């Protein structure tokens, strides 16, 4: 079983740990977070406003975090190169601080004995992998990889199925996205774009996202053919992608539904879901798929121009893919 270290015990760090425990496919052996002490880790892991109580045991014992009887070594280092991952037995490190997202910065984990690093965010220079889309291109010479973003993980499987079957000439994506930790609870200063600093609970906030362009990195044939933007909305979790695209080969909407359903039940099972139910965002809270196609929500203007809708739990679905990517990487050792 893959032995994993988690750097940064925030939303993704905690949920990757939950996903790891639930899957039983990887074992978390170490966690580093300079801002959260051990007893606070117990509390934060046990109680979650979005995903509910952890259904298991969690306690602090002998200076370790013990989850379901598994003792996890705790570090509180600010500098990733000082974390002794090797001593704790961690071979793979999930870099989930959101801070060390380049090859150089994430590479600091290798100094402490980690063998591989998975960045749980898009990266400017690390190779990006999306499970079900381009994970087969991973080879073991790569020490540092990125699991891309939650939105890229939602869009890419859908775009792949559509492109493989009908060809995408060009497309625009909008993600209606739940609030995240980088936003402000009330109006405040924002580093980059002024409106990013407006109160998250009060506003629909247009925002940038590199998720659609990143699809071109994981599906090279779509490079330059997709771009997109986000609306941040006042919901705590679950987001939805709207992909509006021009098709090379004409297709009836029923044809599109058929191929997506076939992919969801076949090669992309567990990654891409399919539903014809009258669902809303809450119905996907805690859903482990990267993307669930909403057959009833999409529309076609004509046989070449369509709007496709797909839901995702931007926290938990993504965290499950981080685990899946590590399992896949380990299978190549």
From Swiss-Prot:
GO cellular component annotations of the record: cytoplasm; cytosol; GAIT complex; lipid droplet; microtubule cytoskeleton; nuclear membrane; nucleus; plasma membrane
Reaction catalyzed: D-glyceraldehyde 3-phosphate + phosphate + NAD(+) = (2R)-3-phospho-glyceroyl phosphate + NADH + H(+); S-nitroso-L-cysteinyl-[GAPDH] + L-cysteinyl-[protein] = L-cysteinyl-[GAPDH] + S-nitroso-L-cysteinyl-[protein]
Keywords tagged on the record: Apoptosis, Cytoplasm, Cytoskeleton, Glycolysis, NAD, Nucleus, Oxidoreductase, S-nitrosylation, Transferase
Activates thiol group during catalysis (site feature) positions: 177
Domain of life from the UniProt record: Eukaryota
Pfam families assigned to the protein according to its UniProt record, in alphabetical order: Gp_dh_C, Gp_dh_N
UniProt function note: Has both glyceraldehyde-3-phosphate dehydrogenase and nitrosylase activities, thereby playing a role in glycolysis and nuclear functions, respectively. Glyceraldehyde-3-phosphate dehydrogenase is a key enzyme in glycolysis that catalyzes the first step of the pathway by converting D-glyceraldehyde 3-phosphate (G3P) into 3-phospho-D-glyceroyl phosphate. Participates in nuclear events including transcription, RNA transport, DNA replication and apoptosis.
Full protein name: Glyceraldehyde-3-phosphate dehydrogenase
Organism: Coturnix japonica (Japanese quail)
């Amino acid at each position: 079983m893959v032995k994993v270290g988690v750097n940064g015990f925030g939303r993704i760090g905690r949920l990757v740990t939950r996903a790891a425990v639930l899957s039983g496919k990887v074992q978390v052996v170490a966690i580093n977070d300079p801002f959260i002490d051990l007893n606070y880790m117990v509390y934060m892991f046990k109680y979650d406003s979005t995903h509910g109580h952890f259904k298991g045991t969690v306690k602090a014992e002998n200076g370790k975090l013990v989850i379901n009887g598994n003792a996890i070594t705790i570090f509180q280092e600010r500098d990733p190169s000082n974390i002794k991952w090797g001593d704790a037995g961690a071979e793979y490190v999930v870099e989930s601080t959101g801070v060390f997202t380049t090859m150089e910065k994430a590479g600091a984990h290798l100094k402490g004995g980690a063998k591989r690093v998975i960045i749980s965010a898009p990266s400017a220079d690390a190779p990006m992998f999306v499970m079900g889309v381009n994970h087969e291109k991973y080879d073991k010479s790569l020490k540092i990889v990125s699991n891309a973003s939650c939105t890229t993980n939602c869009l890419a499987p859908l775009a792949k199925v559509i492109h493989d079957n009908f060809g995408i000439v060009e497309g625009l994506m909008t993600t209606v996205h739940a609030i995240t930790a980088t936003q402000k609870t009330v109006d405040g200063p924002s580093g980059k774009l002024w409106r990013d600093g407006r109160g998250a609970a009060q506003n629909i906030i247009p925002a940038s996202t590199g998720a659609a362009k990143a699809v071109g990195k994981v599906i090279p044939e779509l490079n330059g053919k997709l771009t997109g933007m986000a609306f941040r909305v006042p919901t705590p979790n679950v987001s939805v992608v709207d992909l509006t695209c021009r098709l090379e080969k004409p297709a009836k909407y029923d044809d599109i539904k058929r191929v997506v359903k076939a992919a969801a039940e076949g090669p992309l099972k567990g990654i891409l879901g399919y539903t014809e139910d009258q669902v809303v965002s809450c119905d996907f809270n805690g859903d482990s798929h990267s993307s669930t196609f909403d057959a009833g929500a999409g529309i076609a203007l004509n046989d070449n121009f369509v709007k496709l809708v797909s839901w995702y739990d931007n926290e938990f679905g993504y965290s499950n893919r981080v685990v899946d990517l590590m399992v896949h990487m380990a299978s190549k050792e």
